[in-house]
């Protein structure tokens, strides 16, 4: 997996070159302990929320800024159905405010200045040729 290669060679400058060709795909996802359906739902919907935030251009820094032609961003992530998960209605808003959207999280942990050689590829939002998308949050 490319992320493992980037991690193993981090801090070694240009001693290694990671080629752009992909010879395999290894789908990965967050994991929770077996039979914890409640936590699985929380993790799944949290990921959907940060993916949706990236798709519509919301970042941790801009989440409180108005978007012309769209209702308040905070309202987009005011989700009454969250109570079924044991979460407050604003859980998605607070998550994005704290850690950012999917791209911000990805860049902070797998790319950006820390690992400049890691390309998002299929981890890019579907609007930019990747596979990442979220179902409707309502």
Model-predicted regions and their roles:
Residues 100-108, 114-123:
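Terminal (typically C-terminal) long, contiguous, charged/leucine-rich segments with helical propensity
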Residues 20-93, 101, 113, 127-128, ...:
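Extended ligand-binding regions for polar small-molecule ligands
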Residues 1-17:
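A ligand-binding cleft/hinge motif common to bilobed small-molecule-binding domains
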Residues 1, 93, 106-109, 125:
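Histidine (H) residue identity feature
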